[in-house]
């Protein structure tokens, strides 16, 4: 069995101007839903004596980003939670890993204005945004038997923009 947690919303604002309800909504959808779905999946995986959980985070969970304190905190929290869960359930044959996308061509990145797009592209060594298939291929790998000895890790898929 395998579950992919891929919740992600943004409600951006500078921290001093951010409404607490916007903070909470992003944390609830991005981080808390990942925890709750993982908890449910782990119960099923324990019965089946194996499983894989793949949590989608974000490059900004590692780097921070202007006006996205809530989003960055939610995605960094997923990384830390995944490491803890990986430790808790490794002996039960459950692998828990993250994929941390950089800037991928999606509806979320379509909202970025053209000038900022150029700035971002200049920071990506591969000089392009990723494709959704780049993330899908990473998911397929972590869901496969080829990744059975990988646990508690984050696979960075970002064209070299962030290197851990």
Regions inferred by a protein language model and the residue ranges of each:
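Alpha-helical segment proximal to the catalytic Tyr-Lys
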Residues: 43, 87-91, 148
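Active-site helix of classical SDR
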Residues: 38, 74, 82
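A conserved structural motif in NAD(P)-dependent oxidoreductases
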Residues: 124-135, 146
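Short, small/polar-rich loop/turn modules that mediate ligand/substrate recognition or access, typified
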Residues: 90, 95, 150-152, 158
């Amino acid at each position: 069995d395998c579950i992919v947690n891929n919740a992600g919303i943004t409600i951006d604002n500078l921290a001093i101007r951010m409404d607490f309800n916007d903070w909470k909504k992003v944390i609830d959808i991005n981080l808390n839903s990942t925890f709750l779905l993982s908890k449910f999946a782990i119960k099923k995986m324990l019965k089946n004596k194996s499983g894989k959980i793949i949590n989608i985070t974000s490059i900004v969970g590692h780097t921070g980003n202007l006006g996205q304190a809530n989003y960055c905190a939610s995605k960094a929290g997923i990384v830390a939670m995944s490491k803890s869960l990986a430790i808790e359930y490794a002996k039960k044959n459950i692998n828990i890993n993250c994929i941390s996308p950089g800037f991928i061509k999606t509806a979320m990145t379509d909202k970025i204005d053209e000038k900022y797009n150029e700035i971002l592209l200049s920071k990506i060594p591969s000089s392009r945004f990723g494709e959704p298939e780049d993330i899908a291929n990473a998911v397929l790998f972590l869901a496969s038997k080829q990744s059975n000895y990988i646990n508690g890790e984050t696979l960075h898929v970002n064209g070299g923009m962030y290197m851990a």
